[in-house]
């Protein structure tokens, strides 16, 4: 487990420093698990940016899990953990559709939903 300290100050310099630290910590042949529960509002976006980059550029680096946890959901002592990994891969799929110049992504999404509902 590698812990990277995120500055609570917000601004482009702090965001870029965190992105730099994340990218420096992730090499080739990695299996990554990320938690986006704690931190400032930009933190999950920065983590997703770093994960997107290393997924595309590093050799044999996989995003295994991205989780978000809630400590309080209106009921005492019922924390919930959400697996956001599918959201990461859905974003990757949309980036590939955009790169391919797909003009009707809604049609593709409907087709994928149909496959999942079968």
Give names to the regions the model predicted.
Residues 1-31, 46, 52-118:
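Long, low-complexity, Lys/Arg-enriched
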């Amino acid at each position: 487990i590698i812990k990277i300290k995120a500055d609570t100050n917000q601004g482009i310099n702090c965001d870029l420093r965190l992105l730099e630290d994340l990218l420096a910590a992730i090499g080739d042949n990695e299996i990554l698990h990320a938690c986006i529960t704690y931190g400032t509002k930009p933190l999950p976006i920065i983590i997703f940016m770093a994960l997107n980059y290393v997924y595309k550029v590093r050799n044999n680096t996989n995003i295994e899990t991205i989780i978000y946890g809630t400590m309080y959901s209106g009921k005492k002592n019922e924390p919930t953990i959400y697996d956001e990994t599918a959201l990461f891969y859905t974003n990757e799929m949309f980036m590939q559709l955009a790169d391919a110049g797909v003009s009707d992504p809604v049609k593709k999404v409907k087709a994928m939903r149909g496959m999942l509902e079968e």
